[in-house]
C-alpha cells in the first residue's frame, strides 16, 4: 500500500513524471487511489476495462507491476482457474476473497494492486498475493 508516504511520483511509460497525492485505500482489495497533480488529462490514456466473465481457462494474461521495486515489469501466463475463493486469517478476523482469477503469471511483492490484462491489453483483474 502507498499510505503513509510524504511524496508520490507517478512515471508514465514515456518517462513523463507527475507528482501525486494520496486519496485513500482499501486494504481488503489491495487498492489505493491517488490523484495526479498538474496533469493534462488530454495526454493521459485510461486503461480499457475488459470483461473478466468472458475469460477462459488457458487464455493468456499479463501481470503488470513493480515486483521487488523493478518498475514497469510484465510477466505472462495463462488463466489457470476461475472463480477461486480463499479465506485469510488476521488479528481482526477472517476475510473471504471470492471470484478470484488464478494465473501462473509470476506475482511477487510489488505486483499487488497492479493490472492483470488480457491479450488485448484490457484490464480483467487486479494482482494480489
Protein language model annotation of sequence segments:
Residues 1-129:
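Serine-dependent protease modules
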